[in-house]
Curated annotation (Swiss-Prot):
<dbReference type="Pfam" id="PF13616">
    <property type="entry name" value="Rotamase_3"/>
</dbReference>
<protein>
    <recommendedName>
        <fullName>Putative peptidyl-prolyl cis-trans isomerase Cbf2</fullName>
        <ecNumber>5.2.1.8</ecNumber>
    </recommendedName>
</protein>
<dbReference type="GO" id="GO:0003755">
    <property type="term" value="F:peptidyl-prolyl cis-trans isomerase activity"/>
</dbReference>
<dbReference type="InterPro" id="IPR023058">
    <property type="entry name" value="PPIase_PpiC_CS"/>
</dbReference>
<keyword id="KW-0413">Isomerase</keyword>
<feature type="signal peptide">
    <location>
        <begin position="1"/>
        <end position="21"/>
    </location>
</feature>
<dbReference type="InterPro" id="IPR050245">
    <property type="entry name" value="PrsA_foldase"/>
</dbReference>
<keyword id="KW-0697">Rotamase</keyword>
<dbReference type="InterPro" id="IPR046357">
    <property type="entry name" value="PPIase_dom_sf"/>
</dbReference>
<dbReference type="InterPro" id="IPR000297">
    <property type="entry name" value="PPIase_PpiC"/>
</dbReference>
<keyword id="KW-0732">Signal</keyword>
<feature type="domain" description="PpiC">
    <location>
        <begin position="131"/>
        <end position="228"/>
    </location>
</feature>
Amino acid sequence: MKKFSLVAAALIAGVALNVNAATVATVNGKSISDAEVSEFFAPMLRGQDFKTLPDNQKKALIQQYIMQDLILQDAKKQNLEKDPLYTKELDRAKDAILVNVYQEKILNTIKIDAAKVKAFYDQNKDKYVKPARVQAKHILVATEKEAKDIINELKGLKGKELDAKFSELAKEKSIDPGSKNQGGELGWFDQSTMVKPFTDAAFALKNGTITTTPVKTNFGYHVILKENSQAKGQIKFDEVKQGIENGLKFEEFKKVINQKGQDLLNSAKVEYK
């Protein structure tokens, strides 16, 4: 069975209008509201308010919506609603939606006891651990000599002076396009994120210090500034309880829906040809 795209499904289903909606565009005399665009892209926005997006992002989404609306208008002009392919695909979509509603009804009947959620957490605490992390900057160059020269330029600097000079040199000399313009900033990472020589060097540093020798990887030679660090720690129950509950609920749902399917199969008259 072919899957309907999010765009196609939304256009077929239509979009609920908000009485307080503001018109953001008109298409062939038809008004387009911010509420329409917001609801249309809701799965993609994942709870983010359309109205708070930067103007360029809002405009891009509005343009996408308009293009889809124009395609819909053109399809109607061509009377494609009577096309056999449309009817066939629509029937498939309706069946899929009906099955989804059926399953959601069952899912909503499943309740997970709070004690069971807590017990799962207590029995699996080793899975809910925040790994040790560091925050660092780096300057990547092609040769060991370049790296040594940079280290010499930074020698003796501390605190804000070191940080500022490091950022300046990163912008000037680093060949890493991903961090160069941010002054070499890499953000936070754990021991599984970077290649081992880089990780080992970064984690071995004290906060606010740089590597005193170049760090060689397959990318070149690095000079690293360790900005901050966080030790390995236990993730609190409140941070993960909703995820645990959802996981347990889904596992129970799979058992229930499989049993339901088996019961229906057993009660049906099925003849294999």
